[in-house]
Amino acid sequence: MPRVKRGFKARQRRNKVLKLAKGYRGARSKLFRSATEAVDRALNYAFRDRRVKKRDFRALWITRINAAARINGLSYSKLIHGLKLANVEIDRKVMADLAVSDPNGFAAIAAAAKAKF
């Protein structure tokens, strides 16, 4: 049986990892073993933080809505409850944007929630 040294495929695999590690400092961008560890960790963090990003943005939207609701004399929970009773289906992302960019429009939504509450 002939000996297989895996020259081309091994180099291809290593170069793929080193390409992903481009821009890392020191040995992490030059040495295969260090680069593998760094790239694995980076990909794990990226996977995790794509999910954390969704939580963080929702928390930011809720904070902004709560601040705007309190200006209009409601707490966040009372505003959301009033909107549910009034059958107003507007998501938190849009409400937070309204609160920042159009305070009068948000005040109208808060008034609708207050009327049903």
UniProtKB/Swiss-Prot annotation:
Pfam families: Ribosomal_L20. Signal peptide: none annotated. It comes from Citrifermentans bemidjiense (strain ATCC BAA-1014 / DSM 16622 / JCM 12645 / Bem). GO terms for biological process: ribosomal large subunit assembly; translation. Binds directly to 23S ribosomal RNA and is necessary for the in vitro assembly process of the 50S ribosomal subunit. It is not involved in the protein synthesizing functions of that subunit. This is Large ribosomal subunit protein bL20. The gene is rplT. GO terms for molecular function: rRNA binding; structural constituent of ribosome. It comes from the Bacteria. CDD domains: Ribosomal_L20 (cd07026). Keywords: Ribonucleoprotein, Ribosomal protein, RNA-binding, rRNA-binding. GO terms for cellular component: ribonucleoprotein complex; ribosome. The keyword Metal-binding does not apply. Belongs to the bacterial ribosomal protein bL20 family.
